[in-house]
Amino acid sequence: MSYLKQAVADGVDGFHYDTVKHIELPGEYGSNFWNVILNNGSEFQYGEILQDDVSNDAGFGKLMSITASNYAQKIRSALKDRRISAGNLMNYQVSGVDAANLVLWVESHDNYANDDQESTWMNDSDIRLGWAMITARAKGTTLFFSRPVGDGNGTQFPGQSQIGDAGSNLYKDAIVTAGNKFHNAMVVESEYLHNPGGNEQVAMIERSTKGAVIVNLVDGDKQINSETNLADGIYTDKVSGRQFNVSNGRITGSVPSRSAVVLYDDKASQAAQVSIDGYKEADNSISKATEVTLKAKNADSTTYKLGNGQEVAYKMVIKSLLVKGLKLVNQLL
């Protein structure tokens, strides 16, 4: 524990806990681990859970963020089949856990490096498209696995890099970086998932009226003429530079072959905003202790306070336990 606290003091933001499902939960026989080890002062912590029938996702999800490994499996299946319904894309495949507490990936080191080579078949194009879909979502923290140089297409370890070398530069790809920026810009916006025109080869993730990501899973450009919630205007794709027109609730444009377009208004996304997940602003108090997530976007500084207590500064996202009967105030400075 002293090591973790020292790491935080030295600038570490958080911790990954491997194979957490094999460590007992508080309340189980002889357990005093998680309620001690998680109290280290870090900003973000998550536990790796490879889901199965006995992984107790809900139990661990009450303590920390956890990985949604079954959702990643669904994403990889969609990439292989080159189609996904909006319903399947929407379902995080985890029960009893707030989606804000999920860690999302296209693949993990286990999927790639284990003997069954569950994800090794994917190429860079597959990873780009999968990443575009998960980073466009309103909930969850996305995690990118950096493969060895020369990876994929069934080749696990091509020998072009050694232990300690930098991995693949795919994380710098235009779709990957545009997806990351979109994820941050849309942090407080609601989502609407659909297949334009009912075509499951194309997935569209809209974020309120502010932005959208459209993913074309197949070869050949896809012409889009679909309903949308986006505000009227002309949107320029952050990846290809193509333009999309939105007028009277419809969007038109062309999505490149096996690619994704990322659409949003940079200026509109730069306004400072705050929000609270798990708390209704119309309520004057919380009737019982409740975990919520505070979010801030494009703010130089933000604070929260409980009741008449002291204001506490925080960065971007923080989880807080509300004490019964106290009103929560989340504000920009």
Residue spans for each PLM region:
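Low-complexity, disordered linker/stalk regions enriched in Pro/Thr/Ser/Gly
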Residues: 268-333
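Active-site-proximal helices and loops of the catalytic beta/alpha 8
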Residues: 2-269
